Amino acid sequence: MTIRFWLMLTLFISFSSLAASPSFDCSKASGEVEILICNDEGLAKLDRQLASVYRQALANIPAAEQPKAMQRGWIKGRNDCWKSADVRQCTAQNYQSRIIELQIQGGLLEVPSSVVFDCGEFPQISAVFYTQLDPITAVFSFDDQQLIASNVISASGAKYQGQNFEFWEHHGEASVRYFDTAAKCRIRK
């Protein structure tokens, strides 16, 4: 009975450690962030999810357009989270953003209908809202730009923030800020 117990316990521990491992070899982990990922089950899970989404996205993107260099750049950016006040939170947010970005760019999600906003002097904005994602995410297209922004908490309306971009919609009217440019927009009817 005790031999069987120890055998089962050994197998359980072996499988548990495999399930908690990230997609990369932890014996080769370098730097604070990679070591943290190896020791944090939640971050290891995000790493495995990203690896899976990355493979799926690559299968849908033509070879000439595949974001391999961009992925290496993303890894470097993720590893820069050691500079953050909350290393774990920074790392988790980097993973979540990259997973969503790859799901959208790789065509892994059903694309909802777009909503068009007229913005006066600012270019017309076409917005696609991915409400099936957590956090809700939107792709904003104008001129030759395409920006991905995530829903953030606001007192009223729907507010999305991305890199150097903010979109705040309330009752069909929106405020947009892109770098130092601000505009007021209305849904096109």
What are the language-model segments listed below?
Residues 2-9:
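Sec-dependent signal peptide recognition
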Residues 20-189:
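N-terminal alpha-helical modules
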